[in-house]
């Protein structure tokens, strides 16, 4: 996979790390991750994975955004209250990095 100049500029601080380099950044671009739950940990995890360039991220959650979520689920805004987390998260994340493929699953996970 060839890294474009704009991608190089965006991810340069990761690429210059000896443990990552160009080869490592290419692996990040082609990585697949699944996040189960968009709560207090899932939201920042999604943001950081997106910002680092992970290429494909699945997100699973069944809940809607509630007003009580906003203090710890920093991905969401008051205007998102009442909407399903997975669909709002996809819209927000696509604004951060349009090259990331977000796959929302509105599913309830049970044991």
Residue ranges and their predicted role:
Residues 1-111:
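Adenine nucleotide-associated cytosolic modules
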């Amino acid at each position: 996979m060839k890294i474009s100049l704009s991608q190089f500029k965006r991810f340069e601080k990761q690429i210059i790390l000896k443990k990552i380099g160009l080869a490592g950044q290419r692996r990040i671009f082609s990585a697949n991750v699944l996040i189960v739950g968009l709560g207090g940990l899932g939201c920042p995890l999604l943001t950081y994975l997106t910002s680092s360039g992970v290429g494909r991220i699945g997100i699973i959650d069944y809940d809607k955004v509630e007003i009580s979520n906003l203090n710890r689920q920093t991905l969401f805004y008051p205007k998102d209250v009442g909407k399903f987390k997975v669909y709002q998260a996809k819209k927000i994340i696509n604004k951060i990095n349009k090259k990331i493929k977000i796959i929302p699953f509105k599913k309830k996970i049970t044991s």
